[in-house]
Amino acid sequence: MATVTVSEISNQAAILRAELKEWERGFAAANGGKKAERGDIKKVPEIAAKYKEYSRLKSQESASSSKNDKSHSKPTDTQERSKKRKHSSPNGPEQSQSHCQTTSTPRKSAAGIFQTPSKLKTTHPADVDPYDSPSVLRRLFSPSTHMQTSSPLKTAIGPTPQRDGKALGLFDLLSESGGSTATPTAARMASLKGIAAQTPSKKRKMDTIREEDEEEEDSPRVERTPASSGKKYMLSALFATPTAWKYSSIVDDGTSRGVIGNNDVTKQSPQATRNIDHANANLETPSFLRRSTSGLTGPDPTDMSPLPVRKPQQFVGKGLSQLVQGLRDMEEERLEDEWDVLREIEIEQTGTGVDVPNSQAADPNSTGRTFKKKGQKRTTRLVKMRPVVQAKPTTTRSQPQSLSQSEPRFEHNLVSAGGSGDVDELGIDDNDLVAVAETQADGPPSGRVGIPAAFIDDDLDSLRSISEAEQDSDSDPDYDADSKPLGRSKSFSEKMKEAIGATGQGSDTKQAQERQKVKAKEKKEKENIDTNAKKPSTRKINPQAHANYRSLKIRNRGGGRNFGRFRRR
């Protein structure tokens, strides 16, 4: 009846477990792989009730299974149990014979009756929280989790192998002849078992198997084939970093004479030494490619002490900063010479240089350049060049004609009294006349009528002197600025025409025509002068310009005389 009850309980628990697992998978899929927690289970009352029922069934199943195990256990012979399981009880074989009746399933360890109770390693199902997931309960109640097995890491990872107090590397465990020292052979294990049966006089270490010489080898194992010279060379030179300890500890067999690893100096031949030097010379890095000359072993292979390390060769010449500074000094000297030449040329052009006599006599013995204190170089000063306004001349004066040119023309015109309408008797075109102000009264002079030709020469000389004086005279700018622009004075030809025309016939009509022409030209020139007068220029304002541009201090500019880089601080 009890067996049927246990099977029913296990079936119900399996059904509940399948339902709970299905719900857990659905919850994880809905929440992005998140597992159901205690709070999530409490939110669904049906699932919470199933969890409680599942924990109750599991506790009943465990209680009934323990009762069945106790009732169906049969007493066995103590001798047979001692043969099969020597240490079924934790206290040894003696106690296991006394309380063999209380032993449980082989999967579980038996508990001693007279043993001091200790804290249980597993929690009773009644004490387990009913909201724990089935995976937690399965881990708690599965017998495989309670079996006392050693951790795989403890067997895989052992202590660091050492020899003579020094840690061994991976390649140091390899023997020179190529045999493996880590995995023992069957023959060696048999020999070691025979040794272990004897009474040990001293505790032996089994961490590594030392290779023995042929004379000292008493074990019944078969001798190993000696490794070839190529294999020995590859192991010693390429696959392992040669250290001083390795050369001193490894003892090779008798076949390798004069090769690396043989510490016997007497057995080495000079030919072998030469071979070693040649091999090292081919393998070592060239001197020009080394970063630093490290300590090398001496020519004697038995000498374990390295040579003293050479210090790196120091740079004897100038450094880069000194070379750059020297180039800068040379450039400054060259610029100083150029500035001196420019200053001398400037002084010669302006003529402002004053020679000051030297108060100190020059030393005749001294050679080289005289010392000159270096001052401020390449000084830039702000110079505001304002435009200079010059008043334009208001009138254009005709060039004075010389007497040598005017007198022949005068004589020619006296002979030929007739002429065209545009060209007068003196041969002067109306286009050559410029509007000038009248300097003499209109009409012929009262005292000139009927003057003989003898007095005309004197009048010509006086007129020429007057006209030349007027041309040479300078105008007063203050007076000219206030007064109206005046026309030019009459030229020599005009004055001569007036003087001569007073005596000729029809002079009044000609003079009236000439006056009208002169007045018309004066009017035209006056209009031109008014239009060409300087008008006040309107100030153009850029609408995109900054309003406070003058108040900005841009690169220490525009701050006044004592505001630059070299101002007094």
Swiss-Prot record:
Biological process annotations from GO: DNA replication initiation; double-strand break repair via break-induced replication; mitotic DNA replication preinitiation complex assembly
Recorded superkingdom: Eukaryota
Cellular component terms per the entry's GO annotation: cytoplasm; DNA replication preinitiation complex
Biased composition (Basic residues): 370-384, 552-569
Compartments, record wording: Cytoplasm; Nucleus
Compositional bias (Acidic residues): 469-480
Molecular-function GO terms, alphabetical: DNA replication origin binding; single-stranded DNA binding
Main location class: cytoplasm
Disordered: annotated span: 52-164, 193-230, 289-312, 350-427, 461-569
Keyword Nucleotide-binding part of the UniProt annotation: no
Skewed-composition ranges (Polar residues): 89-107, 142-153, 350-369, 392-407
Chain intervals with Basic and acidic residues compositional bias: 67-81, 481-498, 511-533
Keywords: Cell cycle, Cytoplasm, DNA replication, Nucleus
Alphabetized CDD domains for the sequence: RecQL4_SLD2_NTD (cd22289)
Gene3D superfamilies the record matches: 1.10.10.1460
Functional summary from the UniProt entry: Has a role in the initiation of DNA replication. Required at S-phase checkpoint.
Family note: Belongs to the SLD2 family.
Name of this chain's protein: DNA replication regulator sld2
